[in-house]
Amino acid sequence: MKTELLAPAGSMEALKAAVSAGADAVYLGGAAFGARAYAKNLDEQEILSAIDYVHLRNRKLYLTVNTLLKEEELEEKLYPYLRPYYEQGLDAVIVQDMGVLKAVRSWFPDLDIHASTQMTVTGSAGAHFLESLGATRVVPARELSFAEIQKIHRTTNLEIECFVHGALCYCYSGQCLFSSLIGGRSGNRGRCAQPCRLPYEAYDKDNHRMGELGDRYPLSPKDMCTVELLPEIVKSGIMSLKIEGRMKKPEYTAGVVSIYRKYLDLYEKKPSRFRVLPEDMKKLYELYNRDGFNKSYYTVRNGRDMMALKNEKEQENKKKQRRNEQLFYEIQRDYIETEAKEPISGFLTLYPGQPAFLSAESGKYSVTAEAGMVEPAKKQPLTEERVKTQLEKTGETPFYFKELDVCMDDNCFVPMQTLNELRRGVSDQLVKEMTEPYRRKAAEKPEQEAKASGKPDQESGAEKKMELTASAETRAQWNALLEITEITTIYAGMGCFKREIFEEQAEKGILQAKELGKQVYLMLPHVVREGDLKEYRDTFRCLKEIGLGGFLIRNLESFSFLKEMGMEKDIRLDYSVYTYNSRAQAFWQEQGVQRDTVPYELNEREIGKRDNTNSEMVVYGYLPMMVSAQCVQKNLNGCNHSYSLVRLKDRMGKYFPVKSYCTSCYSVIYNSLPLGLVKEADEIRSMHPAAVRLNFTIETLEETKEIAAAFAGTYCKGIAVPAGREYTKGHFHRKVE
């Protein structure tokens, strides 16, 4: 399969520039549902025109629907939004939401579905699961190495698309709530405000400032540039090379595409001569960079060299530098002012007494046109040169004559208008012939479709007692939760039991909890990379046999791993396996999972309309804002593999805890204040969740005891939580954009 160069298009001008510069395909967002809601984007008519524009040039167009959709958006707006694009010939849709994937498969069964990087696919098991659902392509997490990507390539038939150039998020895509929680602008809804690019001071557990002088941007990665890695990228099984930048100007898009096109072609034609010239690296640098470039995660796990820690100084230096006007002039001239055209071969015959006749061919397409009658020349006969000059004025058509043969009488004449008619005739016919195969007719949206049932009946919902559950990440928290009688289930993080004697300690813990009338579920990591859970396969089976209730999972990789073991009915979903809408809920119910977790970004009105009878709702806990492969501890003070807890201080003086999870090599940034839905207990009861949950992450044993007892009193006995602690309400009372 030919390697595809995939370019961003935030506008029609950028799309045309990308195609002119050599992109094989473009991806863009429309008026809704895209992950770059603040890009200019294209309206419906522009997208319909864009679909034909790329198809006439033998390219492809993919539409982003890579956000999480709320109920009314999915049920009322998505079908009419997608239908005209589908019927025009849209090549694929890029999705994040399982409800959207389910709907698109139902409504448009022959439309290719690309699983967005927002799905946080981190291994072959997750990729294989998406393939089984009908996805044709996967965009795995940017954090994966060549070896991990090769495993996906070897074990699935999916096309693999990876980012090769542009901005790099600090967080695993799809796992970021930072912008949402501090400002209401959700990255999962395409409205990220990029708080990660702001300055922060880092402090260790002893309150010492971390890092070198000037390390003020610990969450801001450099842009990625992997043109020098193209041979390794192609060999790894990546078939689509994706350039980031729908918010960027057309000059940036065209400039970057042209350089990657040059070197991709060079490698495919003469791999032994592959070498990137310094002047081309300089051009990429001048088009845009952030403290220089990194080569993404393909060959490294993380590290200081990937970060733009001193970004402010670099930006000051940039302001003093003059833009390379010659570079931008050349890009404007070659790719923006000059549109890509498809070559055609033409054959013209002009003989007196016969109609003027022109045939044209483009690939497998062949058309003909006739116009007027050729007359004997009364004065000056037409010359072949004059005829060719007129016909080759293809203007705004998508074609140019690569070859034009003329067979004509030496003494003939036709008006220039006749030649124009011939040219228009073959051009219009070719356009129709080349776009018609892409057209298709959508079926009407089905009246009845499988979804979660909606809000349950008040009385039937009230019959079932709401449980109190809690999660623990440390042994101290575990011990504290065992003492709280009202807690029926404990979700034990892997850190609750020592790795060296994990099975032994976990078995004792399960039996101990059982004696106290509690169930235990293992809470699996936020991120599971290739092979992370392999060593636990036999352990999980043994623990199930002695009474383990099941597993609380945070990602597709964990689900797929357990599904392969036949344990899908022992699974509960955490918040990060999103169930924003009833179709997503129904999808996971069909997969056999026991419960989901109410998404943190839904507000009280939206939760109230939801069927929560198989859902848990988190009412206490420090909410995770970022899950990252990077490590503040390592990047600023060096790796100590000690599960460090550091704090980031923002410009407003707020402190955000950052916890390292060294066994799985990732870190989590938590909100500055814990969620505490205290006064909302009665309202939450009326929403009929199966359980409310307390999440403990950084709390001490004493704090865990005190908080768990207080919330147990409120939710189980109606006792008010004592004043004294400060909480946030999260999104319970405010809507995300």
PLM-predicted stretches and their roles:
Residues T122:
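Active-site PLP-lysine loop of aminotransferase-like
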Residues L42-I47:
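Glycine-rich, highly charged phosphate/nucleotide-binding loops
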Residues M1-A21, A25-R36, L48-I51, R57-Y86, ...:
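Surface-exposed amphipathic alpha-helical tracts and adjacent flexible/coil segments at the periphery
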Residues K102:
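A cross-family signal for key residues in well-ordered alpha-helices
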Residues M119, V577:
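Conserved catalytic-core segments of large NTP-driven translation/proteostasis enzymes
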